[in-house]
Amino acid sequence: MLNSDEHMEGSMGAAKIPRQLSGTEIAEIVGGEILGDPGIMIDDVDVIERATATHLSYVGDLKNISRIRNSCSRLIVVPDSVRDELVNYRDRTFILVSSPEESFLCIASMLRPCRLRSTVGISHRAVIDPSAKIGPNTNVHPLAVIGRDVVIGHSCEIQSGVVIGDGCYLGNNVLLYANTVLYHNVIIEDQVTIHASCVIGADGFGYQVVNGGHQHIPHYGTVRICSDVEIGAGTTIDRAKVGETLIGTGTRIDNLVMIGHNCRIGRHNLLVSQVGLAGSVSTGDYVVVAGQVGVADHVHLGDGVVVGAQSGVKNDIPGGQTYFGNPAGPMAEISRQLAALRRLPDMRDAVKRMERELEALRSQVADNRHTDVRPAAA
């Protein structure tokens, strides 16, 4: 293992390519059809609002096609379905494809290639217990701390300020960004990326009342992050009381998500920013939980469930359902309730109007009765 802080270019990273591409070249790369000037040259990419004349940009669908009018971009990737609309923009060159965003990102990766991975080796300014085992081609940056009996696989990246507690296991190709903390005995499988300032394996929020005070409940379990998981910055995942808190293969977790003790997250889930899962929540596969959703303890979300933003989930949701609202309910039902709620002011006015009309009718009936009374015969 290397023992220096010298930075040398490694074997990973994108190959060097020309910094300019023509319209024809881009069309060939993405398999699209070019309409306009095939010789137009671009040197960078940007979103449609900020793009300049030398930037490639894209529009994803018909409803956004009008944004082209105020853009300075001269070369724009668009879906095949908007072909008939392009006659209004004859001063631009277009590349027609089936998936504009995918094609745009393909070119972006070429014009803005990832930085080559530096070979730092094992920095002499890192603090590493002698019992730790670190695989080949792994970088441990200055000021990282690695505890007793830690095992780290090959080609990992341990950035500055990372703390890996005693007994942790990291597989191959794990990337821990700066200031991430793994408490003791956490298990991270292969191809996992954890962004800056995450905390994995802290005790859950568990207390019991003893002698009038809140006494902490020890957590003896751990956290297992399965392979091909990405976790956003500032996310926290608590260890289990016993057993494992589990994050399934292929799951993507956004920034600032909180996952409580003993949760079991299925495969290929998407958890968006500021989601909070209480203890022992479980999910199936391909579940999507939108931003700022709260899920109560022991709730299960079935396969393919989608939960809309800012929902509060208090009961299990069967697979394949889309829920939102607080308390969360089926989309169709909650949509009807919201539609009725929006009509409530008009309904209130209508009821008041009917009350006035009814009162007028009552008065009229009373007057008619009084008029119809005949004096008794002499």
Enumerate the language-model features and the residues they cover.
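Terminal amphipathic alpha-helical/low-complexity segments used for targeting or macromolecular assembly
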Residues: 1-125, 191, 197-198, 202-216, ...
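Structural signal for interior beta-strand "rungs" in well-ordered beta-sheet cores
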Residues: 58, 121-330
